[in-house]
UniProtKB/Swiss-Prot annotation:
Protein name: Discoidin, CUB and LCCL domain-containing protein 2
Species of origin: Homo sapiens
Segments forming domain LCCL: 187-285
Intrachain S-S bonds: 72-99, 126-148, 215-237, 292-449
Transmembrane intervals: 529-549
Any GO CC annotation of this UniProt entry: plasma membrane
Region annotated Disordered, chain positions: 454-517, 690-710
Record localization: Membrane
InterPro entries: CUB_dom, FA58C, Galactose-bd-like_sf, LCCL, LCCL_sf, Neuropilin_MCO_CoagFactor, Sperma_CUB_dom_sf
């Protein structure tokens, strides 16, 4: 037994005057509307006849039901679920209205009611503005509860004790209040949601819910389409109607998958629901289906041209003399060029597709002429199907005794999708236009998959008899309709003068076969996989970093062990020569190791030791070291090698370099057989005793024995200039020694340099001082 809604408006205490109820949607279940019989004061009306009429009326109400009143809003009552609202919802409901809904489901079931919104003014403590819910219908009903309140949170559901329940809404004088929206279902639908629930209300990445009938709300909107998904702010059930997974008149189960949002959501028209353009959101949702949603071959060419036929073809000759024919083979979706167009403009025209065998058809996509200069399209149509091409059946929704009218296009270029729920199992499909713009013209594509019968082999059908070209162009006879399913086209229908869409187009259908290609089918598996991979990757990266750090430390430690030092980069040709003076020489003999002693060290020596040192057979004079001249010195070291401390030394460190003394240090003589001391420098001043400052002079070093090569380059220049200065400065005496090899005198005395008067000006003195410091 289908659900029913009875709406009564009472204003007169003696005679109920029935006001015109708010028009119920044409797709609502049990659309018959009956009013209560008026009161009569006639005394001639016999009592038995009145009781008989009352009994007949009660039987009619029991079978069909009625909806009356002025306080009812959006109402869809299905056999297992439905949705109802107060009048003007979500705007403020008017004063002094009343509406009563009586809901009945099949025997053995109970009713569950859930509220999506409740906002009834409670200023009068629920005396004049309230919603009452009763168990049962009629005089035997018992009250479950009386509810009012602004913004009342009714999260719990209300259940009936039997298969019947009554809702009574009453409004008096009030200021505010949206009213209410409620949905119901049979008790076994534990996961019932309302038409206002969105994806953002649920935290699970995947979930399944039951959508009630009637969720195609006139005030709600969605954003998105398939297969890209819907914005998370879209109502779930309305998006399910648009996607084709549930029917607006029946409701159904949906399986939702949540994923990351996208920057832009497209607008599209499908199943009488228009989705609007949406912008970036944090998440989106889509629906899991079985996947029977592929194209059947109109666009791809799998369906051959002879398999596409029509009632008539539009042909004409233009002003240039060219013949134009918009044949049925041009009715392929997304193919450039003109569409199929009918020659006649009446409701007997059709476009037929032969699939060669039975297939499961889940939907259809249509478009107009796709030509801006020809604004032709079909705005409403019916679907007929057949197994043999002779006996045709009009598509209807389950439990509805009216033909399903599908909404078509609103312009000449946009694609519009409609789904079949339940799907059609047939070989032949006909599209019968009922409304159009100017001319009947369209392109189309069928959606579905192969049909595999369960428990029986595929049914083979014979192809329809061939048709000649004259029949194709001029056929206006209506198709044969199966008895009991749809009326026959026996009388010509009057063409419609307007393109107004009929009320039946608000009924929607759905397809269970939509696949989402942008969302992973199982999020929990991905989470488990990530929980395993992340620790493994962290361990691998940590191990790699440790290996690199250990290798770096080992390399540095190896360098320290080998004692490698970095040297400054000098010229490759002379860097080694310049380093010879800093590197210790490998002494072959004791005599080859030159030693330089400072004057302070000589002073520490006793006279006996000095005499012994000066009694060398041969003495060589060490060449002076000039700071900054690198690569021209032949002696590798000027330090005496450590041979142990002697008693005559006062310095603790024998390698201590000479300090800055107030007097000049003298070079020590270097004997050949023993420690060699630098020999005195003999300056040959005979050639330039009175040379002026501007004239260069020549000085030489004189030594006995093996004489090293003279210094050249800058060093000679410096010596020459020094000689020129020596004529005006103090002279140093040479030691009083005889020929090499002769015994030295008892005591060796060096004269202290004597200061003299300045010979030249301040400029000459400054110049000589500079060179003196260099030497």
């Amino acid at each position: 037994m289908a659900s029913r809604a009875v709406v009564r408006a009472r204003r007169c205490p003696q005679c109920p005057q029935v006001r015109a109820a708010a028009a119920a949607p044409a797709w609502a279940a049990l659309p018959l509307s009956r009013s209560l019989p008026p009161c009569s004061n006639s005394s001639s009306f016999s009592m038995p006849l009145f009781l008989l009429l009352l009994l007949v009326l009660l039987l009619l109400l029991e079978d069909a039901g009625a909806q009356q009143g002025d306080g009812c809003g959006h109402t869809v009552l299905g056999p297992e679920s439905g949705t109802l609202t107060s009048i003007n919802y979500p705007q403020t409901y008017p004063n002094s209205t009343v509406c009563e809904w009586e809901i009945r489901v099949k025997m053995g079931e109970r009713v569950r009611i859930k509220f999506g919104d409740f906002d009834i003014e409670d200023s009068d403590s629920c005396h004049f503005n309230y919603l009452r819910i009763y168990n049962g219908i009629g005089v035997s009903r018992t009250e479950i509860g009386k509810y009012c309140g602004l913004g009342l949170q009714m999260n719990h559901s209300i259940e009936s004790k039997g298969n019947e329940i009554t809702l009574l809404f009453m409004s008096g004088i009030h200021v505010s209040g949206r009213g209410f929206l409620a949905s119901y279902s049979v008790i076994d639908k534990q996961d019932l949601i309302t038409c206002l629930d969105t994806a953002s209300n649920f935290l699970e990445p995947e979930f399944s819910k039951y959508c009630p009938a009637g969720c195609l709300l006139p005030f709600a909107e969605i954003s998105g389409t398939i297969p890209h998904g819907y914005r998370d702010s879209s109502p779930l059930c309305m998006a399910g109607v648009h996607a084709g997974v549930v029917s607006n008149t029946l409701g159904g189960q949906i399986s939702v998958v949540i994923s990351k949002g996208i920057p832009y959501y497209e607008s599209s028209l499908a199943n009488n629901v228009t989705s609007v353009v949406g912008h970036l959101s944090t998440s989106l949702f889509t629906f899991k289906t079985s996947g029977c949603y592929g194209t059947l071959g109109m666009e791809s060419g799998v369906i051959a041209d002879p398999q596409i036929t029509a009632s008539s073809v539009l042909e004409w000759t233009d002003h240039t003399g060219q013949e134009n024919s918009w044949k049925p083979k041009k009715a392929r979706l997304k193919k450039p060029g003109p569409p199929w167009a009918a020659f006649a403009t009446d409701e007997y025209q059709w476009l037929q597709i032969d699939l060669n065998k039975e297939k499961k058809i889940t939907g259809i996509i249509t478009t107009g002429s796709t030509m801006v200069e020809h604004n032709y399209y079909v705005s409403a149509y019916r679907i007929l199907y057949s197994d043999d091409g002779q006996k045709w059946t009009v598509y209807r929704e389950p439990g509805v005794e009216q033909d399903k009218i599908f909404q078509g296009n609103k312009d000449y270029h946009q694609d519009v999708r409609n789904n079949f729920l339940p799907p059609i199992i047939a070989r032949f499909i006909r599209v019968n236009p009922t409304q159009w713009q100017q001319k009947i013209a369209m392109k189309m594509e069928l959606l579905g998959c192969q049909f595999i019968p369960k428990g029986r082999p595929p049914k083979l059908t014979q192809p329809p008899p061939p048709r000649n070209s004259n029949d194709l162009k001029n056929t206006t006879a209506p198709p044969k309709i199966a008895k009991g399913r749809a009326p026959k086209f026996t009388q010509p229908l009057q063409p419609r003068s307007s393109n107004e869409f009929p009320a039946q187009t608000e009924q929607t259908t759905a397809s269970p076969d939509i696949r989402n290609t942008t969302v992973t089918p199982n999020v929990t598996k991905d989470v488990a996989l990530a929980a395993v991979l992340v620790p493994v990757l962290v361990m691998v990266l940590t191990t790699l970093i440790l290996i690199l750090v250990c290798a770096w430390h080992w390399r540095n430690r190896k360098k320290k062990t080998e004692g490698t030092y970095d040297l400054p980069y000098w010229d490759r040709a002379g860097w080694w020569k310049g380093m010879k003076q800093f590197l210790p020489a490998k002494a072959v003999d004791h005599e080859e190791t030159p030693v330089r002693y400072s004057s302070s060290e000589v002073n520490h020596l006793s006279p006996r030791e000095v005499t012994t040192v000066l009694q060398a057979d041969s003495a060589e004079y060490a060449q002076p070291l000039v700071g900054g001249i690198v690569g021209t010195l032949h002696q590798r070291s000027t330090f005496k090698p450590e041979e142990g401390k002697e008693a005559g030394y006062a310095d603790l460190d024998p390698y201590n370099s000479p300090g800055q003394e107030v007097y000049h240090a003298y070079a020590e003589p270097l004997p050949i057989t023993g420690p060699e001391y630098a020999t005195p420098i003999i300056m040959d001043m005979s050639g330039h005793p009175t040379t002026s400052v501007g004239q260069p002079s020549t000085s030489t070093f004189k030594a006995t024995g093996n004489q090293p090569p003279p210094l050249v380059g800058t060093y000679n220049t410096l010596l020459s200039r020094t000689d020129s200065c020596s004529s005006a400065q103090a002279q140093y005496d040479t030691p009083k020694a005889g020929k090499p090899g002769l015994p030295a005198p008892d005591e060796l005395v060096y004269q202290v340099p004597q200061s003299t008067q300045e010979v030249s000006g301040a400029g000459r003195d400054g110049e000589c001082d500079v060179f003196k410091e260099i030497l």
